[in-house]
UniProtKB/Swiss-Prot annotation:
Gene: Cep20
Annotated spans, Disordered: 135-169
Residues covered by the LisH domain: 49-81
Pfam families, per the entry: FOP_dimer
Species of origin: Xenopus laevis
Main location (coarse class): other
UniProt keyword Cytoplasm present: yes
Gene Ontology BP, a term: microtubule anchoring
Region Necessary and sufficient for homooligomerization and localization to centrosomes and pericentriolar satellites, annotated ranges: 1-104
Protein name: Centrosomal protein 20
Keywords carried by this UniProt record: Cell projection, Cilium biogenesis/degradation, Cytoplasm, Cytoskeleton
Assembly and binders: Homooligomer; probably required for localization to centrosomes.
InterPro entries according to UniProt: FOP_dimerisation-dom_N (IPR018993), LisH (IPR006594)
Gene3D superfamilies per record: 1.20.960.40
């Protein structure tokens, strides 16, 4: 006769094999967060940079079907339930896409772009920027000096095809 411990182990193993265990854990976390969330407490005002970053993360989470994580992000940050339009994000971030790159999150293309740029030469210098008086449109994007601009980030099939291959494995 099986013990309670044996039964628990079999159920846990079955749920893990079916890919349900992670979803259940995420759902429980989201429900606990929702129950503990104090809706009377105002959410912080997001800077333009934080809003764009959160939207990029939300798009990434949606693409990967991390819906519970996305719901926690939305609740915790005070993001609107309706995501910003992708064309608005690409315009604000000075991103140029091709048809293939439009099928993956912008964040994938940005990471792929900078990984390729890193292979082609020295790393881009990252400037410490105060978010109080800046938006993404006027943050210097030069490789090694503040006055040069590398131009728009080109998200092309080359920069996103690895993401497609990984996604469909």
């Amino acid at each position: 006769m099986a013990t309670v411990g044996d039964l628990k182990a079999v159920v846990k193993d079955t749920l893990e094999k079916r890919g349900v265990m992670g979803q259940l854990k995420a759902r429980v976390r989201a429900e606990v967060f929702e129950a503990l969330d104090d809706r009377s407490e105002p959410k912080p005002v997001l800077s333009p940079e934080n809003l764009l970053i959160n939207e990029l993360i939300r798009e990434y989470l949606a693409f990967n079907k991390y819906s519970y994580t996305s719901s926690v992000l939305t609740a915790e940050t005070g993001l609107s339930e309706v995501p910003l339009d992708r064309s608005f994000l690409t315009k604000e971030l000075n991103v140029v896409e091709d048809l293939n790159s439009q099928s993956v999150p912008i964040l994938y293309g940005i990471v792929a772009h900078f990984l390729k740029e890193h292979e082609d030469g020295p790393c881009q210098k990252v400037e410490k920027v105060s978010t109080e008086n800046h938006t993404f449109r006027n943050i210097p994007r030069g490789r090694n000096t503040k006055d040069t601009h590398s131009g728009p980030v080109q998200l092309t099939q080359t920069s996103t095809e690895d993401w497609h291959q990984r996604r469909h494995r």
